[in-house]
């Protein structure tokens, strides 16, 4: 299975600042020119919400302050500027290979 290692496990960011979350895969999640890495946001009591798919594509309805980058084994989610509603746990997920796997999550809090 592909192991996804997220960092940091938690971070506290001031309103309007940038939050950066990293995800490293144990092997490449690229195939045929695409990177099969996705990012989700989850708030307590709610299902995960897809933010970014294929490393850098913004899901419909998601604000442009969310952006994703990376390829191969190294990926990043950026949130800028951070807003109050962004306090949540964020997960990376690879969809290149079964079984689909998730990172352990990064909890974003506001200072």
UniProtKB/Swiss-Prot annotation:
Region of interest: Framework-1: 1-23
Stated name of the protein: Ig kappa chain V-III region PC 7183
Region (Framework-4): 102-111
Entry keyword set: Adaptive immunity, Disulfide bond, Immunity, Immunoglobulin
Domain of life per record: Eukaryota
SUPFAM superfamilies tied to this protein: Immunoglobulin
Disulfide bonds: 23-92
Annotated region (Complementarity-determining-1), positions in chain: 24-38
Location of the region described as Complementarity-determining-3 in the Swiss-Prot/TrEMBL record: 93-101
Entry GO CC: immunoglobulin complex
The keyword Transcription regulation appears for this protein: no
Ranges where the record places region Framework-2: 39-53
Signal peptide coordinates: none
Classification lineage: Eukaryota, Metazoa, Chordata, Craniata, Vertebrata
Region (Framework-3): 61-92
Biological processes per GO annotation: adaptive immune response; immune response
Span list, region Complementarity-determining-2: 54-60
Organism: Mus musculus
């Amino acid at each position: 299975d592909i192991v996804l290692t997220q960092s940091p496990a938690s971070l506290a960011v001031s309103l309007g600042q940038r939050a950066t979350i990293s995800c490293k895969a144990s092997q490449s999640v690229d195939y045929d020119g695409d990177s099969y890495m996705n990012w989700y946001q989850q708030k307590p009591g709610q299902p995960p919400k897809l933010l970014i798919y294929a490393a850098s594509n913004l899901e419909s309805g998601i604000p442009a302050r969310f952006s994703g980058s990376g390829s191969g084994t190294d990926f990043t989610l950026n949130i800028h500027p951070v807003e109050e509603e962004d306090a949540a746990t964020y997960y990376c997920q690879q969809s290149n290979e079964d079984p689909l796997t998730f990172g352990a999550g990064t909890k974003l809090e506001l200072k």
